[in-house]
Amino acid sequence: TGSFKRDGVDRIEDNAAEVAQYRSEGFQATKIKIGFDPDEDLRVIAAVREAAGPDMGIMIDGNHGYDAIEAIRVGRAAAECGISWFEEPVVPEQLDAYRAVKDGQPIPVAGGESWHTRWGMREPIETRAVDIIQPDICGCGGFTEIRRIADMAALHGVRLVPHVWGTAIQIAAALQFMASMIPNPVRNNPIEPLLEFDRTDNPFRQAVVKTRIEHVDGVVTIPNEPGLGIEINRDALKEFSPKAV
């Protein structure tokens, strides 16, 4: 995940160059931020597809920046770029708008980071407001609750891809959960789980653990030590703690 809108640079060129860098590092998919101006967003999507080449997966994340009319328009136009999913196209409380977007354009709709516990996920899953549900293990209620959400999604044929955002502690937790995920459907070549791997500049993210969780050619190894597989760097916690002035 990356490709935000930054001040002082040409957004289209900046996002395209960033995705080209991800491709050179071995990543097989990338998620870019949209939800600003629909026309500019579509130009960004086209430029990113050109930079990524034909085989790299591209997801678009609206961060609930559109209304349903805009989201449907963007989805219809962006579909020709081979988009894997359209995340949070509209405000998370507007489930009717989610369903309208899902029905009104061809890209699979994803969402879930803003819904909490199985009770918050129940209606989106049961009414198929989304094609892909994205619970955040640190926001939905932890390991037990995300397991319940995964079971509910499987009952209704909704794909689950965890949302991951924060420090290496959350990355480690998500990796341990993903390692336990049951393929849905069970088959000889199951759908491999995707780890959202934040590439934005955040020195705190990896500083909180003694051994960094990094990728090699776009693949992250699951920590194999007890518990989450990590050891907290308490010196870093002190370093980044708020200081009295």
Question: Locations of the language-model features?
Answer:
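Conserved phosphate-coordination/catalytic loops
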Residues: V9, E13, D39, P92, ...
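Shared catalytic-loop signature of beta/alpha-barrel
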Residues: R76, G82, E93-A110, W115-V219
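A cross-family glycoside hydrolase active-site/sugar-binding cleft signature
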Residues: T1, K31-G35, M59-N63, E87-P89, ...
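Catalytic P-loop NTPase motifs of RecA-like helicase/translocase cores
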Residues: Y66, P92-E93
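Short low-complexity stretches enriched in small and charged residues
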Residues: D14-N15, L42-R43, E87-V91, D131
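Conserved, mostly hydrophobic/aromatic
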Residues: T30, D61, F86, P124, ...
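N-terminal capping/lid subdomain adjacent to the active-site entrance of alpha/beta enzymes
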Residues: T1-I58, N63-E80, G104, R199, ...
